[in-house]
Amino acid sequence: MFDCSMKDPSTFLSGEEMTKRRTPCELNNWVPTVFNRYRESNEAKAYLRLKKGLCKQFLEEVWPLALLTKQLFGDSDQVICEPVLGNQKYDALIEDRRGDAPIQIKVEFTIAVDGYDDHLRMEVLNDKGSANAYGDISVSGTKHTGHKIDIDRSGRDRDELTSNAVRVVTKALRGKANRPYGLNHWLCVKFDDRIWVPNKDDTEAIRASVSSAKQALNLDFAKVFIVGSSGDLLWELT
């Protein structure tokens, strides 16, 4: 059990705890408790936002595993999820015992995000307490003199948001193309639909565009899923 007396954010999460085998229900009950740990202080919030230590794997692999399995398997206790740390060609194992014979699925995760821009927004959020999710970013200064990050206050119209959603998801898919995986591998792309899907009416248009882009890519996976941070969006791309 997590010791709330620990103040160093690097101690809030261990590899042993993160890779524990859980049912989808157990995993989805555990994930919010981890987020709560990092709400204890501004230091802890910054540690999570900048994906330090094991937070990177938690945000980019374990949380998406929870989102994916909740929607696919619900409360089934015949499915076991096991995050895997390391440099192998998968980030998690799913053992599906619902049929006559257990099936093991290897899942590779990736995130649809502009990584450098996202990091800069998190720096501004940590420094100022808020950051425009849509504004253009400019950086001045150097590593030695200190850099200054400015985010303008502009927004994005509906067409810009939907086109950007297609762009970042397609970019994430492209990053996994032309690599050998196999028929027992799934690919899951997580993106923040809370930001990039302005209207539910846009969902199918974005999905259609992403599906079309996928057809042009050589992806060696049995199934490809797109999962949203909201917990409400799950697409299987055909």
Summary of predicted features, one role per range:
Residues Q71-L93:
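A short acidic/basic microdomain associated with nuclease active sites
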Residues N87-Y90, A101-P102, G182-L183:
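Short, well-ordered loop/turn elements at secondary-structure boundaries
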Residues F2-Q78, T110-T238:
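Metal-dependent nuclease catalytic core centered on acidic motifs
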Residues A92, I103-I111:
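Conserved catalytic cores of phosphodiester-cleaving nucleases, focusing on short active-site segments
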Residues I94-D100:
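Active-site beta-strand termini and strand-to-loop segments that position acidic
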Residues L85-Q88, R97, T110-A112, S229:
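An acidic- and aromatic-residue-enriched active-site/binding cleft used to recognize and process polar
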